Design a protein with these regions (language model features):
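C-terminal motif of bacterial Sec signal peptides marking the signal peptidase cleavage site
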Residues: 11-15
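Mature, structured domains of secreted/extracytosolic soluble proteins
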Residues: 2-5, 16-191
């Protein structure tokens, strides 16, 4: 089922770059809608004093975000971190690294996914689209008017509030909520 969902999203997003001008007075130009591409990687462009970068650094993901990509990173605004507890509030604690990594990789999508791509995938999916994350779980994308909203595994809703910030290895989408994956399953205790 997950493979079908991933394939469907890939097809939906892949078809988003086709231009249909039948009901438009101007051509569809996603490149104009996106902010100018920077020559910095995602990691280099993030605020080093920001909560997401600090958490990514603690989890060892800053080197991944400096890698070739492409990635789409859903970066929660700093004030969103005040709403969560657990591994993210105590990101520097080495005991929380595995959980922190699991949560942060839930904020990374493979490939470059623009807001327009998500919106079209939602439209093509009759109101919603499942989006695969790097940790193997999915987010559900919907729309609230013109804004794209992502719902996590526990029901939290994050709106993309500032996005399509292109970098040399992908794109950054800023969201207003920290997204939480489904609880990790624990291996049964050995007797």
């Amino acid at each position: 089922m997950l493979a079908v969902t991933t394939a469907a999203l890939a097809l939906a997003i892949g078809g988003c770059n086709k231009t249909d001008n039948t009901n438009s007075s101007a051509p569809d130009q996603p490149a104009q809608a996106a902010k100018a591409a920077g020559d910095q990687t995602i990691s280099a462009a993030l605020d080093k004093n920001g909560r997401f970068y600090q958490a990514a650094h603690s989890a060892g993901l800053d080197s991944t975000l400096a890698g070739p990509g492409p990635y789409t990173v859903l970066v929660p605004k700093d004030d969103a971190f005040s709403k969560v507890d657990g591994a993210l509030k105590d990101a520097a604690n080495p005991e929380n690294r595995a959980e922190l990594t699991r949560v942060l990789t839930y904020h990374i999508l493979p490939g470059t996914v623009l807001i327009e791509d998500l919106g079209k995938a939602v439209d093509n999916g009759k109101g919603k689209a499942l989006v695969q994350t790097m940790n193997g779980q999915t987010l559900t994308a919907t729309k609230d008017g013109a804004k794209v909203v992502l719902t996590d595994a526990v029901g939290n809703k994050a709106t993309i509030v500032d996005g399509d910030q292109k970098r040399s290895n992908g794109v950054v989408q800023y969201v207003d909520t920290v997204l939480m994956p489904a609880a990790a399953s624990k291996a049964p205790a050995k007797s």
